Amino acid sequence: MKQSMVFSPTLREVPADAEIKSHQLLLRAGFMRQNASGIYSFLPFGLKVLHKVERIVREEMERAGAVELLMPAMQAAELWQESGRWYSYGSELMRMKDRNAREFALGATHEEVITDLVRDEVKSYKKLPLTLYQIQTKFRDEQRPRFGLLRGREFLMKDAYSFHATQESLDEVYDRLYKAYSNIFARCGLNFRAVIADSGAMGGKDTHEFMVLSDVGEDTIAYSDTSDYAANIEMAPVVATYTKSDEAEKALEKVATPDQKAIEEVSAFLNIAADKCIKSMVFKVDEKLVVVLVRGDHEVNDVKVKNVYGASVVELASHEEVKALLNCEVGSLGPINVTGDIEIIADHAVASIVNGCSGANEEGFHYVNVNPERDFKVSQYTDLRFIQEGDQSPDGNGTILFARGIEVGHVFKLGTRYSEAMNATFLDENGKTQPLIMGCYGIGVSRTVAAIAEQFNDENGLVWPKAVAPFHVHVIPVNMKSDAQREMGENIYNSLQEQGYEVLLDDRAERAGVKFADADLFGLPVRVTVGKKADEGIVEVKVRATGESEEVNVEELQTYIANILK
């Protein structure tokens, strides 16, 4: 492709609203442009990268036995109502009405549509297992789109769905697609980890996320320093044991703590260590209000609270709800004198506290010498806190460290969550009606492009891995007015294309500095500069990833490039 014919508008300055490297560079290099908040156009170079990621995805999905189809982006509300998610999915689901006031949603995901499709067509175990996938635009009304392609309102996604007669069949396909996902991200050149995850609004259990390691990731990965254990911090269980001290229990005492609300403030004011304080929070679990206790140096994990109750929605209670429940402000919450009809659950660590402190449910006061069970009753002790760095790894091997990650893929064992809700059944080999057993497997295709850009860049621009680079080789005649340089550039361009390489020829009448700056910004794997030594048959070859350059005789160029790109 000749650069003079390409639409690739570059920017010299970093856009003001672009916070992270991938967002900045994809805009500066002319790979994309913003249409509205969280909505982007892919320009020609960006589209080539996107298509290459799609191709890798398709190859690995088909190798794993999945078959491609395409479902509608607009979905009837009745299907979402049938599954129950019309009411529970939340405000991210884009909803609309047609001229006849019939309700629809723009597809945030396609479980309902695929389940409806398969239940009408697959009636026997003989047609199972079945794995179908699509690559299609998804829509989510993100409250705060940010980070370019990493959190948008419109994005390209590969979603696959598998249907089974037995759990063993689901397990087999799940493992196969888990491997396919590992292959996809490895082929894209990414440094990633597969981690144990929470299923969230998707439902089901046994789920893994594929996380690209990056400091700008919105998720925290907890991993062992000596084993392969890795989990989203939300899902990492705490296996610590807590020993209760033999300190004698003291008499409960209420003390004034004016303007002291946060644990750090109360701890310093009372000269009591944070790990002897009891942090009290009220959560709304579906429609039920529950008091949750953790140690002062720990944080409540709301996913664990959700799992205790098998709830659909868990969120912090509002100030108004707390006031109505306990007649106090949030900063004064405590478990003492809470009426018996209000359930209190606590993390295991709370049980070991002796002579601790807690809020008094009265503004400006706290209790000291608080002892669980003597001073208040707990309905259930369980694991409710986030794991911390330095904790024992849940697999018993090593200690926990943290890393940040960008989620690019997620695989779920949905079970019968959707098939039972939507009456999607089949006849088993005994002629009995059974619900279809399902799996679900998603990859953020456009997000993967951003994740690659986030991992592969330097101070000068993008540094694309060969497998996804828009072109393999960038040929740059320095002076297009020179017949020797221009003709040699054309000859190299044509011969490399004949050898199967994708080549970009910078045939613009620009200064050398502009051409080289754009070349670094685009980040193609190999740059061939045709300069003053063209008359001698010599060109300069530079490897973008390492910065290494060498003068090469043009007759040896193809072999030299083949060795670089092998």
Swiss-Prot record:
Its EC number is 6.1.1.15. Its main location: cytoplasm. It catalyses: tRNA(Pro) + L-proline + ATP = L-prolyl-tRNA(Pro) + AMP + diphosphate. GO terms for molecular function: aminoacyl-tRNA deacylase activity; ATP binding; catalytic activity, acting on a protein; proline-tRNA ligase activity; transferase activity. One of its GO terms (cellular component) is cytosol. Coiled coil: none annotated. Keywords: Aminoacyl-tRNA synthetase, ATP-binding, Cytoplasm, Ligase, Nucleotide-binding, Protein biosynthesis. It comes from the Bacteria. NCBIfam families: PRK09194.1 (NF006625), proS_fam_II (TIGR00409). HAMAP family: Pro_tRNA_synth_type1. Homodimer. Catalyzes the attachment of proline to tRNA(Pro) in a two-step reaction: proline is first activated by ATP to form Pro-AMP and then transferred to the acceptor end of tRNA(Pro). As ProRS can inadvertently accommodate and process non-cognate amino acids such as alanine and cysteine, to avoid such errors it has two additional distinct editing activities against alanine. One activity is designated as 'pretransfer' editing and involves the tRNA(Pro)-independent hydrolysis of activated Ala-AMP. This is Proline--tRNA ligase. The gene is proS.
